[in-house]
């Protein structure tokens, strides 16, 4: 089983307000926000952005989120380094983290098993 493509992007920022305005200017709409400098923006049926503010001394990062339909059936090829296997998240999915050949981490997410 392969992924279904890019589902979203986890994006760290040093300024939630400016980043949200930047994404809004590109056509994204705020879906929800929190009281601690984070939120989700979406563009019609396209990938979402989960944006979270990080401290000034932390380097902002971005992580792509790939979608699979069934976590139990997904078996990445041996070339894919699994950093952490599928685990339930507090936002209602199952999430695996993998590392690409350049050391970047990617998320692979699936719906919760029924």
Segments (PLM) and residue ranges:
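Core segments of cupin and vicinal oxygen chelate
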Residues: 3-4, 10-48
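Eukaryotic phosphotyrosine signaling hubs
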Residues: 6-8, 59-64
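Vicinal oxygen chelate
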Residues: 15-17, 63-105, 110-113
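A short linear hydrophobic-aromatic micro-motif
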Residues: 29, 50-51, 83-85
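Short acidic/glycine-enriched loop/turn segments that link adjacent beta-strands
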Residues: 35-38, 58-60, 90-94
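Residue-level structural signal for beta-strand termini and adjacent loop
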Residues: 36, 53-55, 88, 111
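Short, charged/polar surface micro-motifs in flexible loops or helix N-caps
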Residues: 45-48, 56-58, 70-74
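Short, charged/polar, Gly/Pro-enriched secondary-structure boundary elements
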Residues: 46-50, 103-105
């Amino acid at each position: 089983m392969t992924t279904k493509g890019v589902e979203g992007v986890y994006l760290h920022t040093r300024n939630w307000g400016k980043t949200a305005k930047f994404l809004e200017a590109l056509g994204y709409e705020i879906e929800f926000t929190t009281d601690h400098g984070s939120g989700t923006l979406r563009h019609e049926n396209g990938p979402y952005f989960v944006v979270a503010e990080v401290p000034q001394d932390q380097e902002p990062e971005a992580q792509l989120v790939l979608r699979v339909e069934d976590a139990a059936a997904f078996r990445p090829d041996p070339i894919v380094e699994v950093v952490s296997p599928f685990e339930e998240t507090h936002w209602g999915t199952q999430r695996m983290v993998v590392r690409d050949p350049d050391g970047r981490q990617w998320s692979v997410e699936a719906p919760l098993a029924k």
